[in-house]
Structures are given as C-alpha cells and as structure tokens.
C-alpha cells in the first residue's frame, strides 16, 4: 500500500519556482528513483515586465538590436579584445563629440540671438510733425524789470573782468558798479588756479589759443566761474569754465532760470502771439496752411515754437507723392528784435522732425536754419520692431519702467530720461527744473525760495552724465520705434536777381519792412525723398524648430540614427536604473540574511514552523531553499532522495484513527 502511494508521488509533475529576473525560471526533475517516462519540459511563463539580470546581458542585447551605427561592432568583435577596445574608444569619443556639439547648440539657443530682417515697403505716408522755433528768447512783460536789472549787472561784470562795455543800459552815477554787483547772489568771479602739471610749452600753447576770446585773462593762472554752496554753507565749490564766453552765458542762464520760475502758469503775452509774426508763408502740398494746422508753445531757450501736424490736428497730413513740391514749405522771419544777446548768440531758426505723439526735444534732435539760405530737408521713414522678453531689454508702452512719465505723450527713451532726471531733482533738491514738466504741488527752482538748488543741480548734473543716477539703465528702449532719416541741402535764397521783388512782396503782404534783407529771412522745405520706407524687425535667430533640426543633424552626423534611436537610448538608461535598483534591493535584503545572522534566522524559521498548525502537505525542499537568502540552488538535484518512510501516516498521540501528521525537513536533502 505504501509502495503504491510512493509511485503516485513520483509520477506527479514537478513544481517550478519562478525567479525575479529574466532567465531565472527553473524546472524541477522528478525525485523518484526510477522515472517511468522521460520528463517533459515545462513551458516558461512570460512575465508582463522582464528585465535583464546583469549589465553585460543588457549591453549585449542593446548592441545587437540598436539602430545606432557602430554599436554592434562592440559585440561582433568581442573575441578580439583589441578591436573591442578600439570600437569602444571610438564609440565613446563619437558620443562625447556629439554631446559637445549639443552643448554648443543649447548654449546658442539659450543666449537668445536675434536676426534683423529688412523689408522695403511702399505706400502713402503720414507726414510727421514739424516743430520750428525762433531762436529768440522772449522778454516777458511780467519780468521785464528783473531782466533789465540782470542785463545791467551782467554788463558791469563784463566791464570788471574784461573792460568791455557796449550796452546802452549801463547805469552811471551815484550807484557804484560794486554796489550793483552785490545785489545779485552767486557773482561771476575770476579765480586763480595752479598751473597745469605738464610742461610750460604746453601751457603757453593753451594760453595763446584762448587769449583771443578773453584778452584780459592770463589762462596760466585764472579761470572764470561762480561759487555755489549747500544749505548751511559747509560745502562749496566753484563752477568754472575755461572760456569766458561759456562762463558768462552759463552764469546768465542760471539767473535767467530763477527769474522765469517766478512767472505765473498762464501768461496773456503768450496767447497774444500769432504765427504771422514769425512765418511769412506756409504751404503743404501746394495748399496754404491755416491756424488749425499748428499749435504754439514757448521754450525758455529757443523762444516761440510752432508745431505743425501734431496730434491735435484733426486731419493729419498725408503724402501720396515724393518731392519738394509735395511737402511743407515755410518762409521765416529771421530777425531778432527785442532779443536777449547774452542768452542766445545765434540767429535764424531751429527745426525738428518728430512723430505726432512725441514731444519736441529741441536740444537733442533739432538743427539750426541759416538766414538768407533755402534749406531743403528730405526725409526717409524707418521703423524698428524689437523683440522683448528673453530676446531683448525693451518695453512696449513704458508701463513696466520704474519712472513716471511727466510728459503728455507716449513713452520714448528721451521722455523717460528727462522724467527720471526731474524725479531725482525733486527728490534731492526739493524743487523742479524749469526746462522739464513738473508734477502737481511742486515748485520750480528759485534761489529766493531754494537757496542751495544751484549747488544741488550742478552736482546732480555730474552724476546724471556719468549715469550714477541710473536713468539710462532704468529707461529701456521702446520695442517699436519710428524715425526719420534726414538729409539737408542748402542754396542761396533769394537770388541776387530776384531779391528785390521778393522782399517787396513780403513787406506788402505782411505789413513788415525787412531792414537787413538777406539776414532777415530764411526758407525751409521739408518733404519725403521717396515713399519707400524701410521696416527693420527682429526675429529669433534660433527657434525651437531650428534647434531640433540642428540636434537631429548632429545625431545623424555622428551616429547615423533617427529619433527612434534616442528612444532606444532612453530605454537603455531606464533599464540601467532598474537593474541598479534591483541590485540595491538585493543588497539591502542580504544585510538581514547575511551568513553571520544565519543561525538566528534559522531559529526564527524553526520556531515559526513549530508554532504553526500541522499540515497535510510539505513544501518542496527547493521552495524552502528559494525562500531563504543565499545562492540559487542548482536545477539538477544530485543528492539522494529523502527517506520516504518518514512521509507515511503516523498515529496521533491521542490515538485518533482519522488524524495524521507528517514530518518535513526544513532544509534540502
């Protein structure tokens, strides 16, 4: 009976234990002493996810199946170590060169280079705004007495320094010149300075070159300037100039600004001024101008100014034809009656071309017109569109610039710079500079109210020029700019043969007699040279499409592969990480099942089995060996079979006939 049971056990198919790694699957042979039939191999069960059991197997599989050129040579030449080493070094060098090129391409992309695209367009053009000034600072009736007093003090100063006197306003009599000079703060002085450190020969050449303008000053020892101090007189300096002309003009300008600051906001004298006092004739596209085509304002240094075709014009001028006859033509009065000779030393007019929504900065962009000359100014329009963001530091409308726009116009870099200086002036000096707009509730600078504003202003001007105020850094360039490239031509006007009838007609038409014929008039023509205008636009030099194309070209150059090869490389890296993780997991588990802890582990297993209820089935010795850490058992069992007699039923201690127990070995055979 027992023999029959043993034969049934031998004829049962062996159990198999699947492993964790690929290729780790085993088949157990029958344990019977004499198998009745050959053992049939059991089909391996394929797992959903299988991994290679070693790095060597992984690299061999990759090199045999990848589409990357040269990788298969590492496997095909494995029996020749020299070839294997050669191809390995070549493959690694090629791989390194490719990724070096990749680094250059990514570096170029993240530097955000731009390309300049130039397009030539042709269409009807909006005529720009034109501002023209008289170059004649105005003597306001409201401050006439103060200006006359300043003229008398200036003449006395020139007489004391240069022995020069030509004005008819000089006051002689009981009031001495010294008393007259003492009535004005910050007097102009002649200051002794040490000789220059370089040789006397160089000093003599400098002195001789400057002595013509200032005959009373020895330039080895003297300079002209005026003293400025802070509020408590603890710090003072001299604002000096090497030229007496520059010193007198700047000193006069400084006092003139203080007088202008006392004017009220609105002046009736400015409203009474009309265009006919300055412009004899005005035509655009052969049509006469009218009062609705211009606006008037006053500049402290350039006098009365008129802006044609500005944003206040309801119908902006359009140019549909180029040429001198299809633009703006003006006949100007260039005489300077009732002018301020110490403030303005030139005659003629000053003109500037700008956009409709831009203020006219006559100091920055204007140029002068000569009397007795016809000036023809041809224009060519250009637009520039910059890229913002990572590609360039520009602003669209100035809303992201930390400077308040004090001008009633759109954002430009000049508007921002002047507003920034005015903000610094108000913050440091406590008053506003009269040449720039001011915020509400802020007064213009006047040494009667702000005694040290001149000291603060000239110090601030030095910091502004050296960009210590940060205005040039804060004020970014606008992303969209429209400019006009100007070129001027000059001709004598009127000619000798035509000047008689021209002056006669001008005098009768305007009820004005030209005293000095040629020096009293000027003419200017402003027109488009051509209707073709150039558009300069920036575009990214390296886009994402260009970057991917360059990367693909480099990959094909060094490996002759495609984008699927990149996926293969990603799969290789993923498999490497998985194998590394599994090896670390094995090492982590082996720390708790190390040989030094084997006795303790066996005791724990024995106690667990002893405390468990009896079972009718015994685990296979191979499964027990696999459940314990250590080297995997051999697929073929060479040890003798266990004692089968011990597997028979034994009577229970209680003598129960139906109960049976079995004794199972914990280890292998």
Curated annotation (Swiss-Prot):
Query: What role does this protein play?
Result: This is one of the three pore-forming subunits of the heterotrimeric epithelial sodium channel (ENaC), a critical regulator of sodium balance and fluid homeostasis. ENaC operates in epithelial tissues, where it mediates the electrodiffusion of sodium ions from extracellular fluid through the apical membrane of cells, with water following osmotically. It plays a key role in maintaining sodium homeostasis through electrogenic sodium reabsorption in the kidneys. Additionally, ENaC is essential for airway surface liquid homeostasis, which is crucial for proper mucus clearance.
Q: Please give the annotated consequence of changing residue 61 to L.
A: In BESC2; hypoactive mutation resulting in reduction of protein expression and a significant decrease of amiloride-sensitive sodium currents
Which organism is this entry from?
Homo sapiens
User: What name has this protein been given in UniProt?
Assistant: Epithelial sodium channel subunit alpha
NCBIfam families registered for this protein in UniProt: ENaC
| Stretch list, region Disordered | 1-43, 620-669
Q: Where is this motif: PY motif?
A: 640-644
Disorder cited = Pseudohypoaldosteronism 1B1, autosomal recessive: A form of pseudohypoaldosteronism type 1, a rare salt wasting disease resulting from target organ unresponsiveness to mineralocorticoids. The disorder affects multiple organs, and is characterized by an often fulminant presentation in the neonatal period with dehydration, hyponatremia, hyperkalemia, metabolic acidosis, failure to thrive and weight loss.
Q: What is the lineage of its organism?
A: Eukaryota, Metazoa, Chordata, Craniata, Vertebrata
């Amino acid at each position: 009976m027992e023999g029959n049971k043993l034969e049934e056990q031998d004829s049962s198919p062996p159990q198999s234990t699947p492993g964790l790694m690929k290729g780790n699957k085993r088949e157990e042979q029958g344990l019977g002493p004499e198998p009745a039939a050959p053992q049939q191999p059991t089909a391996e069960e394929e797992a959903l996810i299988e991994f290679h059991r070693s790095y060597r197997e992984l690299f061999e599989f990759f090199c045999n199946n990848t589409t990357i050129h040269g990788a298969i040579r590492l496997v095909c030449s494995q029996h020749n170590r020299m070839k294997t080493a050669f191809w390995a070094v070549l493959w690694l060098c090629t791989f390194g060169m490719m990724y070096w090129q990749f680094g250059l391409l990514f570096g170029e992309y993240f530097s955000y280079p731009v390309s300049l695209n130039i397009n030539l367009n042709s269409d009807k053009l909006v005529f720009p705004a034109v501002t023209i000034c008289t170059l004649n600072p105005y003597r306001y009736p409201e401050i006439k007495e103060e200006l006359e007093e300043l003229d008398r003090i200036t003449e006395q100063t020139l007489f004391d320094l240069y022995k020069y006197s030509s004005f008819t306003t000089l006051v002689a009599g009981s009031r001495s010149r010294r008393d007259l000079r003492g009535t004005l703060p910050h007097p102009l002085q002649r200051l002794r300075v040490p000789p220059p450190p370089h040789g006397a020969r160089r000093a003599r050449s400098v002195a001789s070159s400057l002595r013509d303008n200032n005959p009373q000053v020895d330039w080895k020892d003297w300079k002209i300037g005026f003293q400025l101090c802070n509020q408590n007189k603890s710090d003072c300096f001299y604002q000096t100039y090497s030229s007496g002309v520059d010193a007198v003009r700047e000193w006069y300008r400084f006092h003139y600004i203080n007088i202008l600051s006392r004017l009220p906001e609105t002046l009736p004298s400015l409203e009474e001024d009309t265009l006919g006092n300055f412009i004899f004739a005005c035509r655009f596209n052969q049509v006469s101008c009218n009062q609705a085509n211009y606006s008037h304002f006053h500049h402290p240094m350039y006098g009365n100014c008129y802006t044609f075709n500005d944003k206040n014009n309801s119908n902006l001028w359009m140019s549909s034809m180029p040429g001198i006859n299809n633009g703006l033509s003006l006949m100007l009065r260039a005489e300077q009656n009732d002018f301020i000779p110490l403030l303005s030393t030139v005659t003629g007019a000053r003109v500037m071309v700008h956009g409709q929504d831009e203020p006219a900065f006559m100091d920055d962009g204007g140029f002068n017109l000569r009397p007795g000359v016809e000036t023809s100014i041809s224009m060519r329009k250009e637009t520039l569109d910059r890229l913002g963001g990572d590609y360039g530091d520009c602003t669209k409308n100035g809303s992201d610039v930390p400077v308040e726009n004090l001008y009633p116009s759109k954002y430009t870099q000049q508007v921002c710079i002047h507003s920034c200086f005015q903000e610094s002036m108000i913050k440091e000096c406590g008053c506003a500079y009269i040449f720039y707009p001011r915020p509400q509730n802020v007064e213009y600078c006047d040494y009667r109210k702000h005694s040290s504003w001149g000291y603060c202003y000239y110090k601030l001007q030095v910091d502004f020029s050296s960009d210590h105020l940060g205005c040039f850094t804060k004020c970014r360039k606008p992303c969209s700019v429209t400019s006009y490239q100007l070129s001027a031509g000059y001709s004598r006007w009127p000619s000798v043969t035509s000047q008689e009838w021209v002056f006669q007609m001008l005098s009768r038409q305007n009820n004005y007699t030209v005293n000095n014929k040629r020096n009293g008039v000027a003419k200017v023509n402003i027109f488009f040279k051509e209707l073709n205008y150039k558009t300069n636009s920036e575009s990214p030099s390296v886009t994402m499409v260009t970057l991917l194309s360059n990367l693909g070209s480099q990959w094909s150059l060094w490996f002759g592969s495609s984008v699927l090869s990149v996926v293969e490389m990603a799969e290789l890296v993923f498999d490497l990480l998985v194998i590394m993780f599994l090896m670390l997991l094995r090492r982590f588990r082996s720390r708790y099942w190390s040989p030094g802890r084997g006795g303790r582990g066996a005791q724990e297993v024995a106690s667990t089995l002893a405390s468990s209820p009896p079972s009718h089935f015994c685990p296979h010795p191979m499964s027990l060996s696999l459940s314990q850490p250590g080297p995997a058992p051999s697929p073929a069992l060479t040890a003798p079979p266990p004692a089968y007699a011990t597997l028979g039923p034994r009577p229970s201690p209680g003598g129960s006939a139906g109960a049976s127990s079995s004794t199972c070995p914990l280890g292998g055979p």
